[in-house]
Structure formats: structure tokens, C-alpha cells
Amino acid sequence: MAVMAPRTLLLLLSGALALTQTWAGSHSMRYFFTSVSRPGRGEPRFIAVGYVDDTQFVRFDSDAASQRMEPRAPWIEQEGPEYWDQETRNVKAQSQTDRVDLGTLRGYYNQSEAGSHTIQIMYGCDVGSDGRFLRGYRQDAYDGKDYIALNEDLRSWTAADMAAQITKRKWEAAHEAEQLRAYLDGTCVEWLRRYLENGKETLQRTDPPKTHMTHHPISDHEATLRCWALGFYPAEITLTWQRDGEDQTQDTELVETRPAGDGTFQKWAAVVVPSGEEQRYTCHVQHEGLPKPLTLRWELSSQPTIPIVGIIAGLVLLGAVITGAVVAAVMWRRKSSDRKGGSYTQAASSDSAQGSDVSLTACKV
């Protein structure tokens, strides 16, 4: 497998960016690559997306007409043409690495050429509120299952099966972890700092959730109480239910946090309660944008029982809007890359034309 794919893996920027402020909480930058083979229909489809925290800022799709890495956030558009040229070269190189890796992995698993197969890769870094490196990661998957992952020490690998052991031995012999570590705690961090500064108006904002509760009768004896949090940023939020002060985690239906399509997020948590006992239940909301946690209780006189078909439909639509990003994110691991070369492709130091991603062009899987 190749080591970080070009554009989508932060390339470089050796020049240190002076940090002039402290950020609230930690921040992350992640790249996701997905390659899907299409037997009889030409080259595999390759999709790359980059995220800073919960914001997608770049995207590449080999099926798109432009055949270019494209901006997905206003603050990244200020990067010059050299940056976009480099980013495009990087992802195209990664797509070719994955193309070869798909064939290699098919051989490892003794699979025929008839079926479609998928390679997924995720890598990136986190920084603390002071802008310093916290952790780095690299995870690869094949056909939706873990394949190989960089351990927390950034010096060793964990292989998921016998086939992945082959890749592990290759990468160990080529010292791939050392090269990747240099990128993760160096180049990746510098680019993340740069992006946080350039996009601070959106990336460092906190939008508190708008909350309310809805009541949905199930029968004469039971009803569902649903606690809603809408329009918040960043995505991290906690919704919990209590009955007479006791946690109801076991009985809570909790959906994953969902993008709202406007840069904010939505989430709800629900419990089924005996009719007439609604006021014994409270919903507790914690979010970075709130000065203190909120407590909500159903008040029969304050709002009527309402249907939520419209709200649910809206959430479904929002989910569809970001399907493209999810496709890449679903790849949450995998990167059986096969590249030619021996180390990450890094452009000249402090050259902003370089991408923030890295080129995984070294070892083959």
C-alpha cells in the first residue's frame, strides 16, 4: 500500500506559522480516500475529501468533469493556483496507487476479477488549544473491513489479518511509519494551523443549539418524548435523558449527529414514557456554545403534541445533500496503497502551493 495519497494527505508547508492566539478546544484535520473498482467499466472511481474539524474544505471525484481538486469552503479559495495544481497531482497519483493496490489485494485474498472491491483510507492529525500536536492516525480498510492501522505510538502497525501482515512487513522494511510520523506531527500540524487561522471566522466559532421537545403518543398508555438540538456548531454535543434524576441511557434512542446542510448540525434523543408521567423526565443538553448545560422538561401547557414528519424529512434531505462527503468518510480506514517512490512527496518548505495532504507513493501493499 502506498503511504499517504498526495493532495488529500496534507502536503507541506515547512515554514512555521506563528500562533498568535489560543483556540478553544482541540482541532483536527482528516483526509478520506475511497477507491471502488468497476470491472468492465474502466478505471476505479476515486473520491478524496478533506475536513478541518467538521467542515469539508476540499473534494476530488475522478468521475467529475473538472478532474481537479475543488474547494468546498470559502476560506480555502484564497489559496493560489499552484496549491490547486499540486493538490490535483497528489490525488491523481493516489488514485493510481489505489488502482494497483486493488489488484494486489485481490490477489492476496484470492478473489476473481469479476467483483467490485473497495479501498478506504483515513489519516490526519489533532492539535490542542495551544496549536501543538496531540495525535496522528492512519487507518486503511479493504471491502469495508479493517486492514491495517498505524498505532498510537506512530512507530508501529497493527495488521487485521494474514494478508495485512504482508503489507505490514513491507512497510516495516521500508520504514514507512517514520516517514508518516514526520508528516503527521510536522507538515500536517502546520497546515492545520494555517487553515484554522485563515478560516477562523467559521472554524473557530461556536453556535449554541436551539432546543425544544416534542411529544408523540404511541398508545393510550405510552408516548415518546423527543429532545431536539438544532443549528449547533461544532458537531460535538451531549444529549441525555433522566427520570427523577436517574440516567436513562439504556432506554434512550439516540441518533447520530447529522449535518444540516448550512454548516451546522442536528441531533435528537428520545425515550418512551408512561402516559401521564412525562414531567418526571428531563433532557440535558451540553455543548461548547452554551454558557451552562440546558435542562428541558415537557410542559403540556407550553406546546401541543406535534408530528415531526416535516422535520424528519428535512433531516433525510440534509443527509442526502452530504452523501458525497459521507461516501468518502465511510472509508474510515483502509489504505492499501501501492506507490512508486520511497517517501512522502513534500514540496519546498514554506511553499503554500503545496497541499496540506501527503503523497502516499512509497510502498505497495
From Swiss-Prot:
Effect of F33T: In allele A*29:02, allele A*31:01 and allele A*33:01; requires 2 nucleotide substitutions
Outcome of swapping R138Q: In allele A*25:01, allele A*26:01, allele A*31:01, allele A*32:01, allele A*33:01, allele A*34:01, allele A*43:01, allele A*66:01, allele A*74:01
Effect of T187R: In allele A*01:01, allele A*11:01, allele A*25:01, allele A*26:01, allele A*43:01 and allele A*66:01
Binding site for a peptide antigen 1: Y31, T97, Y108, T167, K170, Y183, Y195
Region entry Alpha-2, spans: 115-206
Gene3D superfamilies on file: Immunoglobulins, MHC class I-like antigen recognition-like
VL9 epitope: annotated segments: 3-11
Official protein name in the record: HLA class I histocompatibility antigen, A alpha chain
